[in-house]
């Protein structure tokens, strides 16, 4: 077994105090996202999306956040993917933003709701053309005999859609994750980290400090 117990560091970038918290967690998330971008973090919009299959087995993968507002968090994916199939059976999901360089994490629990075709199309048309074509190529989570199969199909579809717009695939969509709770974690000295949990109750958010 490889021993990693000596890998550690102190957290020194500041604390989080209840007096500084807005009543709406989305305001704090927007501030932290802005600060993550200003700090030039690599992929600040990258989040871990966790789902569960019919046997209770959890799965995780990194997906890019594409939009957020008071209603929730939006991401897009292939509707034939493992994550989409699991969401169809159980739409309770967890999102996690690991902003290690600025000693912060955000963890979100909620339910994923499918976006309308109009909402999906609006985003799809903003993607680079090669990314639009790639959406047609990949049968996400299916087995491939070789990478050449994927590349061959990409160039085939690229020739097919050489002229004009790339249409939206019927098997490509998106989700709005409506949060039921949002936890903000700020690293603290001596491992005395600051954790605040916002829990949705009716039309209000209840705030609790959690032990580190």
From Swiss-Prot:
Residue sites binding substrate per the record: 8-11, 66, 123, 127, 131, 191-193
Listed GO biological process terms: pyridoxine biosynthetic process
Catalytic EC class: oxidoreductase
Cofactor(s) needed by this chain: FMN
Note on how the cofactor is bound: Binds 1 FMN per subunit.
Function: Catalyzes the oxidation of either pyridoxine 5'-phosphate (PNP) or pyridoxamine 5'-phosphate (PMP) into pyridoxal 5'-phosphate (PLP).
Listed name of the protein: Pyridoxine/pyridoxamine 5'-phosphate oxidase
Native species: Shewanella sp. (strain MR-4)
Lineage: Bacteria, Pseudomonadati, Pseudomonadota, Gammaproteobacteria, Alteromonadales
Gene: pdxH
């Amino acid at each position: 077994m490889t021993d990693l117990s000596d890998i550690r560091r102190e957290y020194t970038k500041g604390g989080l105090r209840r007096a500084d918290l807005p009543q709406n967690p989305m305001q704090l998330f927007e501030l932290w996202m802005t600060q993550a971008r200003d700090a030039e973090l690599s992929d600040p919009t990258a989040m871990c999306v966790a789902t569960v299959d019919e046997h209770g087995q959890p799965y995780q993968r990194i997906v890019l956040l594409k939009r957020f507002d008071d209603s929730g968090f939006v991401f897009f994916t292939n509707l034939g993917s493992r994550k989409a199939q699991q969401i169809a059976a159980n739409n309770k999901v967890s999102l996690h933003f690991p902003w290690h360089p600025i000693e912060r994490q955000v963890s979100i629990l909620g339910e994923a709701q499918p976006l309308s075709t109009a909402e999906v199309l609006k985003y799809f048309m903003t993607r680079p053309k090669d990314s639009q074509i790639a959406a047609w190529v990949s049968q996400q989570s299916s087995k491939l005999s070789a990478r050449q199969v994927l590349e061959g199909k990409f160039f085939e579809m690229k020739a097919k859609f050489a002229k004009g717009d790339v249409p939206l695939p019927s098997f490509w969509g998106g989700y709005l994750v409506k949060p039921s709770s949002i936890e903000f974690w700020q690293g603290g000295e001596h491992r005395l980290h600051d954790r605040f949990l916002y829990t949705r109750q009716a039309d209000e958010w209840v705030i609790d400090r959690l032990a580190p």
